[in-house]
Amino acid sequence: MTTVSHELDDVIHEIACVELGDDKMAFKSDPIMARFKETGTELWVDTGDLQKAKSIWKTEFTALTTNNTLANQVVQTGVVDEVIGQTVSRLKEVAPGLSEEELVTEIGFVINCRIALRLVHSFKTGVSVELHPSMSRNIERTLNYARRYYRVCPEYFTIKIPLTPEGYLAVRTLRKE
């Protein structure tokens, strides 16, 4: 599948999005991290695991970064089992013609969004989300999924695009937008 229909895209967007509350948590400062930050360094935490991030987060941290491997680790904990079940049911209802590969891709998109949105909700900071490597050689798919991630949370999501010739072309197009 190179693109998702606008109708299906709207349904997936609805499934992927969750309301963000205003309950930012308070975190402690770390003097060593403060010294790093004073040098102009931006400190990012590399995890999709909300509890792990909460246990190490300091006020000096700038953002969080996730990727497909980290998202898979979260999936293995069972935290998103309900989301997966609801997503499968809803997609089979509205798009019964999706192939297994298309269904898995869309479920992955929803899971990545939900994991990243949980982090945004808790930390009220930027979170990078990564396009799946299977899209790395297809400009149209790269553009489509990058736009879809951006649509979910433009204020907080940074979209990581695979470093391929097609990725460079996609970035050039997206920067113009």
Predicted regions and their residues:
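Surface-exposed amphipathic alpha-helices with a cationic face
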Residues: 28-37, 120, 150, 171-177
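Short, functional N-terminal and low-complexity linear motifs
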Residues: 18-23, 38-42, 54, 111-117, ...
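N- or domain-start disorder-to-order transition segments that initiate the globular core
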Residues: 2-48
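Exposed alpha-helical structural elements
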Residues: 7-11, 31-32, 52, 82-86, ...
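Active-site beta->alpha loop and helix N-cap motifs at the rims of alpha/beta catalytic domains
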Residues: 60-61, 68-171
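Glycine-rich, flexible N-terminal cofactor/catalytic loop recognition
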Residues: 31-64, 69-73
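Context-gated lysine
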Residues: 24, 28, 37, 52-54, ...
